[in-house]
């Protein structure tokens, strides 16, 4: 459990977390507040993440999380730059003429923010495991096999990792039975390395089977 208190000045010898005021470790409202090398100033969230992020995700993932998730929120906090997540959390604030409820609203916002962070952490760690699994599969791939097609034993998120390779298609078991074939995008692009024939577009079931010549083809 944790406890919080709103005060105007920091307490001498206090060993908890002081943020936003009193030149505490996470106060970002001073003239000499820190700014990242890319020009985005630190807010309390960024300063907290700088201290705790590596412990949660490891150094490499913590840096990626800071760039993709923390920095936009810090920028919103410091400049007012629009950010949908910041707006969502801010929507928990009571209306100006609503009696009380500030603490309750705060804890609801904390609960939602906590769930979002937990999900984000799980996704980052899961993607890291996926990248390692893909590396293992690539290392054991038959050198005589078509280098542009990769067959996976199970679904593994791999679009980003494989964008750096020549692999154009990935085949993996479908949770609906059979197999899925998925084209891979070019690095830093929304375009595929190799697309299916345009004649296949929009076709389903028997029409797709007739056009492809595959009796089991479906979309």
Predicted regions and their residues:
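N-terminal small/polar loop signature for handling phosphorylated ligands or for N-terminal nucleophile
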Residues: 2-23
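A basic- and aromatic-enriched beta-loop-alpha substructure that forms the phosphate/nucleotide-
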Residues: 16-94
């Amino acid at each position: 459990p944790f406890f919080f208190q709103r005060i105007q000045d920091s307490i001498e010898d206090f060993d908890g977390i002081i943020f936003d005021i009193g030149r505490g470790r996470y106060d970002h409202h001073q003239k000499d507040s820190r700014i990242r090398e890319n020009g985005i100033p630190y807010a309390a969230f960024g300063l907290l993440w700088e201290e705790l992020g590596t412990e949660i995700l490891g150094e490499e993932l913590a840096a990626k999380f800071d760039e993709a998730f923390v920095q936009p929120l810090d920028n919103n906090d410091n400049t007012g730059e629009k950010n949908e997540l910041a707006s969502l959390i801010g929507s928990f604030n009571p209306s100006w003429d609503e009696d009380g409820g500030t603490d309750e609203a705060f804890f609801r916002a904390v609960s939602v923010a906590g769930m979002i962070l937990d999900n984000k952490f799980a996704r980052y760690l899961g993607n890291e495991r996926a990248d390692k699994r893909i590396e293992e599969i690539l290392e054991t791939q038959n050198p005589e096999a078509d280098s542009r097609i990769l067959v996976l034993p199970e679904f593994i998120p791999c679009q980003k990792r494989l964008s750096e390779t020549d692999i154009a298609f990935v085949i993996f078991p479908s949770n609906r039975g059979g197999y899925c074939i998925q084209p891979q995008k070019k690095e830093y692009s929304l375009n595929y390395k190799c697309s299916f024939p345009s004649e296949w577009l929009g076709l389903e079931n028997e029409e797709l089977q007739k056009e492809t010549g595959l009796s089991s083809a479906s979309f």
